[in-house]
Amino acid sequence: MTDGAARLLSRHLAPPPAPHSLNIAPPTYSSREKEEEAARRVFKHAYGRLISRHPTVRWTSGQWMTERPGGSDVSQTETTATYAPSASTDDTGPWVVNGYKFFSSATDADMAILLARTPGSSGLSAFYAPVQLPSGERNGVRIVRLKEKLGTKPVPTAELELRGMRAWLIGKEGEGIREISTVLNITRVHNSVSAASSMRRALAVAKAYSRVRKIAGGRVLSTVPLHLRTLAQMELLTRASTHLAFLAVHLLSLAESPLKTPPTAVIVHQGSASRLLRFLTPLTKAVTAKMCLSVISESVEALGGIGYLENEEPLNLARLLRDAQVLAVWEGTTNVLITDLVSSLKRPSPSGGEDRSYFVLGEFIQENLGRGAGTLKGDSGDLLEKAKIAIWKVWESLTEEIECGSREELTAGGRRLLWRLAYVFVGTMLLVDARRDGDKGAVEAVRRWVLRREISLGERGRREEGGIEGDAILVFGDENVRHGKFKL
């Protein structure tokens, strides 16, 4: 939320002032222009606080949108903002906000980005508000009650009554949804990275436990084929989430700083990053959250009763599971994200008909599937070539489905659409990774995700070559298997 707020405010900072000639009188400003200049000054101060790493300087930001009538549907927002310039000279803002926020994320933050309805405007507007006034008093904010949550308890969530809260308008009246989407995109990317990192942490605990836990006959748990197969499936989903999450990070970097992002193994054409990000953000957030819950739950089970206990913090999978549940809830549940994704895929064109901007997805897939083809020889090269063909066939089928299906039909079957898209994009990224250096674990991941379609925990499809040794390579790495650090 803090990163998202910083990015949003950075888009409204004043440009550097042009130098004035000594012979030219300084320009005069209207009251509205003076107010806009004051807003930019306030935003610049807040932005500096948000990006600071100094503990006594830095700020955190909350995000207050959810209200009782609407939940995820912010169009039902009842909070109002009235233009009422203060006679004082402080920087508290010329707007007065009144309303009730049912969920306030980061209640202990120093500032907040919120939505409110202004008189005479059909849309919502976005506002910046400090939580405290310069006098030290709270800025019209009353905490009604703290929420009792399943997890993420160190991050307070509360119901708030806003009465006379002073605020600054961000952008134009009625364009709050467009403004707040900047924050939503970044928080959804953060959500995806949190999912991938939580999976990796849980899996690391499960792997470490499997290498020291001895069962009947003194056999180490990691050498039991069934347990090893389970770890391999968890590893596959963790890799899938990591690739998706950091593809979104890369696209976000390109969208914000196209000239400062170093080249990578992934082909993204200049100007297409923002469009790709628009489609992939809801997809990535939804899929990584689901896979995260599956892997962490399985990690708890992999430790048996020990996993269900409240352990020391580094090993506390019980808390990790509680905290991870929010990843599929906040910033859009799975169905909300699917609706958002389908809306992007079937968006009407301003000139009539449908906007086929989703063709950028096909261009990305085609170019990255073709990049580096033929660099690996032998069995691995043949496997990757089969995978490339399989991915492209599914994408062609998806394109036809998107082209011919109505918005209602695609939304109703949205979960299937979501996972088929995930199959294509994860498969493409796994293929790019495997071609990069021919790592056996990466090639094995392609075999399982693309050719065996193991996109969820549990056996899927027919048994293929790779078997137990493939499990070991995927989980513990080829080096460990070859040098005897892992023995079946």
What do the PLM-derived regions correspond to, one by one?
Residues 1-48, 105-106, 330, 438:
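Internal helix-loop-helix
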Residues 62-111, 274-290, 294-310, 318-326, ...:
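Flexible, glycine/threonine-enriched loop-and-boundary segments that flank and lead into catalytic domains
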Residues 92-138:
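A short core secondary-structure module
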Residues 135, 144, 156-187, 204-223, ...:
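A glycine-rich, basic-preceded beta-loop-alpha segment at the flavin cofactor/substrate interface
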Residues 239-285, 301, 399-411:
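C-terminal helix-coil-helix/basic helical segment that borders enzyme active sites and/or dimer interfaces
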Residues 240-247, 292-295, 333-334, 340, ...:
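Extended, well-ordered alpha-helical segments in internal regulatory regions
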Residues 271-364, 458-487:
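Alpha-helix capping/hinge segments and adjacent helical runs
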Residues 364-488:
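C-terminal amphipathic alpha-helical interaction region
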